[in-house]
């Protein structure tokens, strides 16, 4: 058997060559020399058959030539060039340039006879090749109604080579070996003429075949700009506007008791999950329950041991403080029994079914926990107390979402949960939308909560007694954007709120995703708040909902919010203050009280400030600031503040109703009695701001810092009182200060209406006059977005010869959600907020036009100097805000670029027959389609943002059309914000994605070339094989034919596994690996045997590989969940990820490409379907890709299905081939019965096709 090294098709096109690697040029030269000898021998024999064309040429890509004369190379050159316009069906003798006539006179007759026999064998072999080509053309030129143009195949050899180690298990090919096809065979003359006309029509238009590594200046420049912009974003994110870390370490002595009897009789997940009870060793040494049940739910890939910092603090706080406080025990305070769940570090952020499984398990766990308190052998609880009926739930990260999910599950026990506290939990939307199940689960949960709180009557609200507090870590949390922790779109402010750790008194620091569990300052505040809502005297184990909300606001909010309740107006007088009847202690109306030290008089002294009447035209506000702690009633401290009214006591009237009495009149009969309320319960704790202050918190290893005490009341809140009494209780001189005053709200509050564009261009300046009040407030309504960062600068306050009482203190704050940040010793401040964020649903209560970022400035009013304040947008700092808010964009938006590039490749290929490289197509797209699409999306975003018609909005949010209701999906589109100021984000993200796609393309090229080089080195043939003349003729390991049955069996096995055991994401990963293998093999062949056909196929499979790799991140999270479940021996299949239709097109397409078949060209109207499909996917990826990223897999799956259909039209085992077989059967039956036949040309073509299909 003789192996053909190269040849030409009937139309003159060059076929791919197979030769042993790596001595291709040497073997080619040897074969050409042999064929010259054969041709020379044939010329000396008059009876010899006509000469034939040489059969061994190695084509190389060249520019199309307009000349009709074919170029031929010398034997030393390994290539032959032919004009694409010269189509010679029966080529004559081919002359070799540079080869003169050969001398045959010295040959013997036996040698001449041997040469003649060899020539006859070559003629027979060529005739067989021509017959096979004609048969293949006849079968493939009429493939249904699609009007394909068959492309070049991959492997030019018609002999089946031996298997190679590099051949994939998916490497199959049809029984008929692929050939290099150009024009139709001799079957029909009119088909040949049509091909000639079409070829002449597009000749000169074919693009020049360029290297896949080539890049134009335009593409390079745009890619550098995109990558540079991405580098600026990343650099800004990690270097600018970084909140300082202030958490102190916590310590504990953990112990865990596992409940082994909570088994499969209680829940079907008992073999996967476990329930534990935490015990602080040294304090709680047994496993009996005795207090209030609290359930901790770990987050995504979290551990049950993460409960230990909070549980340890609770055990120590009750043991050291509350247990010794009889009033607290009488009020219902008891120890906390912390239960925790071992989820085997389940991954819930990416998989909705896992989230539902955990919620189902936890409901059964709560049922079991409550039953423990009924078992006297396992409970050490006071029998006089009611049995618990509910559990307090703490959730971290996704554990907080699981906690809310429990209430919508069918196995939820009514009223078993009434208090939920979550930490860094993404309530507003899923962290990623790669799984359809988690997107649906989030929608079901949030819709249920919104629907419950929209009920008019409490009886119709199943969540009426539930309170939800969401605590966010702030800017240091880089795992989940803290914007997603907002619950303003889920619950009204009567049932829950969102607060940031920077707002919590005595915490005042941001925290990362894990530190929020072990931060010492925060866990102390959290534990105290939990103990404050506990009441074991009630079966619910907690106080009523209204009282719980009041407690949470007091512990977690600053106390200066509008919702903060003041206790002074609602309390009865508790202190009786007796003063002399002289007016020396009364401050004149409108004057300010300033004390630079305490105890200077050596005795207790009272300072009275008259309270202005509430009916005055100018609104007044009382403020007091001191660096001393305010005493409660009957406490022996240094300073006490009272709100007093004249007490008209009659002679002999009892004064026993007062808890404390302060007598400053002595034995004087001329005295005034005042009934007073103590203001210590309303005090606001502020961080101390001195010249030595750097941070509002104390860092690890630093001694605790002193704090400022601040009081703030509107006159209406204290209108029932007549005086504010400031009592100096110390008898010895003590350093410190007190400033108290009544100020006009009009002077202390300012609102600046300035557009963001003007703020960006010119900044904003304002001045605090020398006659300013102690506290000034500034509100800027336009500053709401989380995407902007600001710089604030404040000038020095000049106090002259007087000593400065305190350094400037600044508080920035938002009201929805509750976020406050403090800047001590402020000279400048880096301002960033978590306000209106991309993709976050709008709140239940619409925002006021006056809502926005606000600032409070505490400055020393005794310094008679102006203070200038300047504010500007920090452009570089704002770039860093894009990282956390738009990370998921880069899983969807680059698909816009890839699909547009692939669309351009197919359009050029269908027109010219050349499948250009990805980089060349990207260059063409950057000159037209990509800018146009980005411009269209930009105008579309402006149209959606500025549309005031709800009907127009419903066009895009068709899944959430509710008349008269809030559209909670209005921020799901495009870049997720309705602020037209950010219109430029669409082209900026597009620019970055172009750079990312370019880098990713070259990374893939590099990987493919590295693998190709590695395979070439591993397959290097040793010398004893290279010197074997018979082994030299073995072809390269390329694309080998395999039986269709084997291909179908392999596909069927994969589909069966997907439908039963493995998720389709695993099969998709396998497809990507096989496609990578195919690309490596195509690259080897394209580099070893240079031809247009090889380059076309390599560019094609490379682009398909890039498309599949961009979808891979969407499928990997589910695959990770599946592998994790296998690791914990949980073999229950995913019900939501076994749809074979989600992977079958990919398997078929990848199987087809392993055979080396190039996709046929489409010249009919169906070629527009490819363009429309890819363009539609590009638009979807840009508009809906972030919110519904899981849909991108299904859309690309449609592309794979369409390409598989296109491939099947030229495949001899395709469905269309089966239709042809049926047509041939009917044709034969019609001829036999002499009925139903067809006439004319169609009859001849069908008969020829059926005849050739019957030939072996």
UniProtKB/Swiss-Prot annotation:
The keyword tRNA processing belongs to this UniProt entry's keyword annotation: no
A GO molecular-function annotation: phosphatidylinositol deacylase activity
Keywords: Endoplasmic reticulum, Glycoprotein, Hydrolase, Membrane, Protein transport, Transmembrane, Transmembrane helix, Transport
Top EC class of this enzyme: hydrolase
Membrane disposition: Multi-pass membrane protein
Record GO cellular component, one term: endoplasmic reticulum
Active site: 397
Glycosylated position list: 41, 45, 155, 235, 582, 960, 1212, 1239, 1242
Record's compositionally biased regions (Low complexity): 59-68, 107-135, 165-180
UniProt biased composition (Polar residues): 37-48, 69-83, 143-156
Skewed-composition ranges (Basic and acidic residues): 190-202
Gene Ontology BP annotations: GPI anchor biosynthetic process; protein transport
Pfam families recorded: PGAP1, PGAP1_2nd, PGAP1_TMD
This protein's name: GPI inositol-deacylase
Lineage, opening ranks: Eukaryota, Fungi, Dikarya, Ascomycota, Pezizomycotina
């Amino acid at each position: 058997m003789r192996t053909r090294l190269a040849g030409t098709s009937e139309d003159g096109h060059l076929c791919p060559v197979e030769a042993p690697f790596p001595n291709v040029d040497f073997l080619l030269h040897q074969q050409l020399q042999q064929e010259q000898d054969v041709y020379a021998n044939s010329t000396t024999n008059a009876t010899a058959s006509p000469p034939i064309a040489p059969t061994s040429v190695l084509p190389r890509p060249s520019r199309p030539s307009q000349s009709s004369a074919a170029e031929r190379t010398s034997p030393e050159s390994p290539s032959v060039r032919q004009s694409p316009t010269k189509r010679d069906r029966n080529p004559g003798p081919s002359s070799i340039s540079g080869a003169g006539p050969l001398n045959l006179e010295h040959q013997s007759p036996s040698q001449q006879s041997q040469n003649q026999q060899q020539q006859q064998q070559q003629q027979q072999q060529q005739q067989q090749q021509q017959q096979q080509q004609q048969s293949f053309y006849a079968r493939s030129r009429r493939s249904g109604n699609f009007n394909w143009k068959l492309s070049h195949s991959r492997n030019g050899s018609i002999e089946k080579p031996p298997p190679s180690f590099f051949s994939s298990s998916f490497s199959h090919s049809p029984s008929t070996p692929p050939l290099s096809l150009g024009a139709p065979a001799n079957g029909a003359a009119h088909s040949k003429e049509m091909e000639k006309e079409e070829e002449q029509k597009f000749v000169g238009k074919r693009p020049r075949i360029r290297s896949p590594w080539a890049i134009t200046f335009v593409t390079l420049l745009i890619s550098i700009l995109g990558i540079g912009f991405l580098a600026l974003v990343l650099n800004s994110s990690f270097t600018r506007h970084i909140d300082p870390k202030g958490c102190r370490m916590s310590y504990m002595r953990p112990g865990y008791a596992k409940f082994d009897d909570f088994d499969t009789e209680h829940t079907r997940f008992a073999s996967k999950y476990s329930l534990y009870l935490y015990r602080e060793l040294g304090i709680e040494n047994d496993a009996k329950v005795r207090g209030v049940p609290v359930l901790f739910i770990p987050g995504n890939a979290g551990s049950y041991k993460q409960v230990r910092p909070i549980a340890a603090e609770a055990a120590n706080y009750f043991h050291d403080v509350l247990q010794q406080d009889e009033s607290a025990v009488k009020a219902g305070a008891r120890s906390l029994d912390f239960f925790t769940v071992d989820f085997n570090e389940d991954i819930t952020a990416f998989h909705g079914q896992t989230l539902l499984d955990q919620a189902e398990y936890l409901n059964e766990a709560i049922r079991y926990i409550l039953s423990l308190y009924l078992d006297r052998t396992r409970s050490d609880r006071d029998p006089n107390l009611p049995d618990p009926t509910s559990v307090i739930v703490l959730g971290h990260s996704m554990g907080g979402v699981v906690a809310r999910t429990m209430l919508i599950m069918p196995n939820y026990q009514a009223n078993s949960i009434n208090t939920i506290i979550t930490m860094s939990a993404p309530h507003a939307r899923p962290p990623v939308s790669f799984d359809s199940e988690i997107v649906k689960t989030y929608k079901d949960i949030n819709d249920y909560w919104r629907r419950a709180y929209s009920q008019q009557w409490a009886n119709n609200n199943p969540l009426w007694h539930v309170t939800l507090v969401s605590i966010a870590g702030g800017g240091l949390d880089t795992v989940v954007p803290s914007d997603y922790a907002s619950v303003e779109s889920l619950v009204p402010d009567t049932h829950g709120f969102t607060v940031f750790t920077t707002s919590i008194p005595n915490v005042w620091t941001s925290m990362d995703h894990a530190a929020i569990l072990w931060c010492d300052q925060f866990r102390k505040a959290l534990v105290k708040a939990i103990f404050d809502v506990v009441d074991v005297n009630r079966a619910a184990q907690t106080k009523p909902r209204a009282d719980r909300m009041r407690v949470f606001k007091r512990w977690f909010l600053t106390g200066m919010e509008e919702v903060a309740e003041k206790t002074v107006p609602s309390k009865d007088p508790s202190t009786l203050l007796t003063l002399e009847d002289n007016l020396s202690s009364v401050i004149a109306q409108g004057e300010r009280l300033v004390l630079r030290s305490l105890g200077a008089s050596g005795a207790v002294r009272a300072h009275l400030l008259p309270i202005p009447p509430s009916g005055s035209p100018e609104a007044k506000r009382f403020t007091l600031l001191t660096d001393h702690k305010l005493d409660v009633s009957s406490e022996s401290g240094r300073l006490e503040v009272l709100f007093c009214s004249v007490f008209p006591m009659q002679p002999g009237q009892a004064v026993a109703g007062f808890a404390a009495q302060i007598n400053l009149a002595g034995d004087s009969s001329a005295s005034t009695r005042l009934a007073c309320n103590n203001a210590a319960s309303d005090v606001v704790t502020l961080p101390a701001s001195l010249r030595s202050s750097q941070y509002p918190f104390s860092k690890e290893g630093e001694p605790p810092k002193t704090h400022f005490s601040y009081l703030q009341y509107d006159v209406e809140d204290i209108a029932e009182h007549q005086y504010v009494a400031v009592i100096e209780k110390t008898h010895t001189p003590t350093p410190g200060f007190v400033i108290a005053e009544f100020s006009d709200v009009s002077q202390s509050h300012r609102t600046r209406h300035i557009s963001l564009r003007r703020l960006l261009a010119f900044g904003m300046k304002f001045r605090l006059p020398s006659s300013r009040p102690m506290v000034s407030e500034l509100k800027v309504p336009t500053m709401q977005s989380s995407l902007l960062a600001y710089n604030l600068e404040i000038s020095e306050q000049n106090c002259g010869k007087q000593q400065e009482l305190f350094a400037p203190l600044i508080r920035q704050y938002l009201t929805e959600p509750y976020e406050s940040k403090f800047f001590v010793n402020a000279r400048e401040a880096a301002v960033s907020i978590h306000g209106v964020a991309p993709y976050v649903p709008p709140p239940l209560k619409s925002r006021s036009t006056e809502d926005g970022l606000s600032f409070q400035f505490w400055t020393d009013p005794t310094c008679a100097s102006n203070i200038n304040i300047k504010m500007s947008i920090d452009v570089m700092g704002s770039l860093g805000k894009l990282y956390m808010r738009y990370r998921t964009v880069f899983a969807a938006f680059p698909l816009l670029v890839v699909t547009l590039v692939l669309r351009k490749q197919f359009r050029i290929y269908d027109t010219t027959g050349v499948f250009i490289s990805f980089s060349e197509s990207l260059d063409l797209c950057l000159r037209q389609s990509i800018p146009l699409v980005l411009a269209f999306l930009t105008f579309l975003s402006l149209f959606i943002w500025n549309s005031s018609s709800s009907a127009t909005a419903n066009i895009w949010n068709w899944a959430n059309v509710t008349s008269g209701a809030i559209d909670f999906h209005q921020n799901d589109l495009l870049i997720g914000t309705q602020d037209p100021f950010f219109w430029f984000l669409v082209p900026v993200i597009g620019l970055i994605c172009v750079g990312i796609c370019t880098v990713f393309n070259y990374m893939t090229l590099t990987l493919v070339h590295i693998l190709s080089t590695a395979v070439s080195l591993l397959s290097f043939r040793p010398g004893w094989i290279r010197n074997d003349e018979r082994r030299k003729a073995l072809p390269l390991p390329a694309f080998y034919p395999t039986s269709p049955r084997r291909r179908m069996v392999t596909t069927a096995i994969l589909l069966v596994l997907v439908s039963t055991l493995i998720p389709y994401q695993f099969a998709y990963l396998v497809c990507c690996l096989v496609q990578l293998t195919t690309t490596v093999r195509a690259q080897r062949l394209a580099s070893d045997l240079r031809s247009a056909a090889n380059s076309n196929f390599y560019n094609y499979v490379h682009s398909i590989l890039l498309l599949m790799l961009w979808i891979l991140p969407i499928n990997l999270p589910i695959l990770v969940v599946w592998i994790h479940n296998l690791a914990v021996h949980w073999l229950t299949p995913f019900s939501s990820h076994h749809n074979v239709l989600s992977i079958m097109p990919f398997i078929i397409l990848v199987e087809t490409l392993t055979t080396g078949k190039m996709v046929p060209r489409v010249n009919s109207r169906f070629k527009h379907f490819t363009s429309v499909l890819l363009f539609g996917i590009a638009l979807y990826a840009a508009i809906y890709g972030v919110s519904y990223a899981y849909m991108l897999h299904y859309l690309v799956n449609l592309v794979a299905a369409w390409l598989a259909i296109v491939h099947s039209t030229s495949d001899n085992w395709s469905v269309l081939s089966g239709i042809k077989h049926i047509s041939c059967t009917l044709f034969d039956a019609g001829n036999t019965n002499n009925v139903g036949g067809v006439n004319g040309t169609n009859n001849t073509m069908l008969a020829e096709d059926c005849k050739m299909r019957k030939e072996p």
